[in-house]
Amino acid sequence: MPVAPRKNKKEHADVDVRGGLRRPTLPPYRAARLAVIVALSAFVIVASRPVATAPAPVAGYQQFLSPASPLEVVAARKADRIAWVAFEEGKRNAYTAAAPAFTPVRLTAFIKDDGIDMSDVKISDDGSTVVFVRGTAPNRDGWIANPTADPNGPERAVWAARTTGGPAFRVAEGANPELAPDGSSVLFTKDGQIYRAKVTPLKPAAEMDRGEKPFIREWGTQSTPRWSPDGKKIAFVSTRTDHSFVVVYDMATRMVKYMSPSVDFDTNPMWADGGKSVVFLRHPGLPFAQQAQQGTGTIGLPNGPGFQANTTGRGRGGAGAAGATGAANAQPPRIADVPGLQRATFKGGYTLSVMKADVGSGDAREVWHNQPNDPIATTLANARLAGDYVVFPLVVGGGRGGRGAPGTADDAPPPPAGPVDEWDRYYSLNLSSADSRPVLLTTTDGLIEDQASVEISADEKTFYYCTNAGDIERRHIWAVPVSSGTPHQVTFGKGIDTQPTPLASGNTLATLSADWRMPQSLAVWPLATSASLDRKIVFPASRKGFPLDAHVEPQLILTKAADGMEIHNQLFLPKDIGPGERRPAIVFVHGGPARQMLLGYHYMQFYHWAYGINQWLASQGYVVLSINYRSGIGYGRSFRTAANTGGSGNAEYQDVLAGGKYLQTRPDVDPNRVGIWGLSYGGVLTSQALARNSDLFKAGVDLAGVHLWGSSLDPDAVSFKSSTIGAIDGWKSPVLLVHGDDDRNVAFQQTTGLVQLLRQRDVYYELIVFPDDTHESMLHSRWMYTLGRMETFLKKFLWPHKTMTTDGPRR
């Protein structure tokens, strides 16, 4: 096998800091252009002779990553119109379409690969106005990503467009817009206050109307503003350190009213009864032991006990650590054993209430509360209202439930804990019932990943959700009445359907849809008929140049790790493998680790690209295995929470090693030509493979990987031994490292530190650094450059100079 070229210290690594490019080979576009010129010259010379039909050109990574992809979709509440954000080779734009034709119309004209993100798309109730955010979220230092290093600096701002036509326009600097039902203005929070900006292409005269001066300025920190259905009132949360209020602002009177103010934490306001009521959640306020406010030293304003504990080595500093003024190793103070001093509950011992307030009077009543000492129903995170019902997800243990849960009397003790359910479940709670009991909606066994996976119909009667129930390697849409009932499947087949978005009429469902050779698209499904048979692809309208026929259908392959853990993988086999031929192979490891690769194009942007890259690698002749290692999602809670993973033991690497060994046993794989690639957590496992098993993995591409778990450099620490650097002396194989230095997920120092270790061990590496770029590069051009380098790197170290067969090498 070829040996990595030896270079002196100065030339040991092929380093590329973009902006100071040094590359030994022609860029792909120049190489392609040269090939075209040569081919045309040859054609001129032999044109007078009979020629055979030329074979179809092999598609490159450029073609596999060329189609426009919708990223998120929303629907108007009172019109059959949808809006979405699309990514088109680095250009991010907003689109809209309306029933019945659903012809896509581009609303914006951002025609450059400028690295400016677009997100948070919203549409008014009548579908006339669409708003969205341009710019990334700030990092921990408050810096918005600026991947093009624009000297003017970056901005994050709310933009808008009319679906009837006209250019898009900037509304105000801000994010997370809450669009008024009529589309006339947006709300957003900044510096703990609520701002409003009018949605108009003409610059308003007043600062307040431009979103430059607070619209609602109150004591404390204001958050989660929510318009009433008629747009005449705003509900929001006002947090005051040890308690919080739900507040309603009246647009006509410019007055606020507090909903049943108390000493407790009131959160998550939801409008009910057409705007006459507000439903919210209530948790107990802080007991004395948890109060950490700094006082003035007067009789009525002492420091909170929690503040005192922090300064004496307890609290934020932790026992044995110095606080603001305390000494190291100080003993924590004694706390009186008095009920209610350290832990707060409501009377009866419960810790969560669902409240319903009358907006006119401000009075509220309790609708439901959880059980005393209930470890499950503690927050009702992501609860949403559907008519008279609150719908919410729970992680459920066997036999547990809230007050009035099925089979549980209000005064009965909680039943013994059973095994934890492998899946999150959604429940509904009837607010109109005097003896309300949570009702289980999602009786299907499968993953419901996040809030983008669920939606409620416009008439508030049906709960739609995306799950892998019944088809664990894909995603489909299911539906169930919010009042209770048996869920039914809406989409079928080999597709991957996500982000269910029911339209106002109730006749149509929009989704993001893909399959093993169709990249993510925007689809609409008629709900009155067999949806899967009548699906219509709305966007993109064309995939010209996309190599549809170059795809191979991935196979599900099960492997077993050394400890017996069964792992699901996708295998991509090249179409042109000859009898007895052995090919190079590549392992792909996803990031997260809370991810699951599927038997088709993924719904998340990078993993959508990763699937396309794996298809491209297979089209180039590699046998590709994509591994769904333990601690990922899709296979139940026990798999997701597997023991001894990451910095606690690196157990998931066993799954990667098992995948590599599986490839070595295949008769169509050259066992001496196995590589590996991945980003983020995939970079973690790529580096682990190269450090621990360079005998198996002969080359790797590590994008933004973590190489040291935690911060301990103690060689006996579990985190150190679980890290790549704990096995660094075994690293012999070449690696291509890629990282942006404004990474908000993995510290750039993880690559900085690794390079120092590789240099000292004379390990061949190539390095690409993208200044001012993030975890996943924001620029399409940089992805194209990275893949070009990856192609050259893998060919150099994995593609044999001799073709291996089952009978041995041949020239």
Where are the regions that the model predicts?
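Serine-hydrolase catalytic core recognition
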Residues: 287-289, 325, 347-352, 380-388, ...
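Residue-level detector of Asp-centered blade-edge/turn motifs that repeat once per structural unit
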Residues: 77-78, 125-126, 181-182, 229-230, ...
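Hydrophobic beta-strand positions that form the internal "hydrophobic ladder"
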Residues: 82, 127-130, 186, 231-234, ...
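Beta-strand-rich domains and repeat architectures in extracellular enzymes and scaffolds
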Residues: 62-93
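Short loop/turn segments that connect beta-strands within beta-propeller blades
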Residues: 98-102, 162-166, 199-202, 250-254, ...
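A flexible loop/linker signature enriched in serine peptidases of the S9 family
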Residues: 85-95, 110-117, 131-159, 167-176, ...
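Bacterial N-terminal signal peptides
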Residues: 34-46
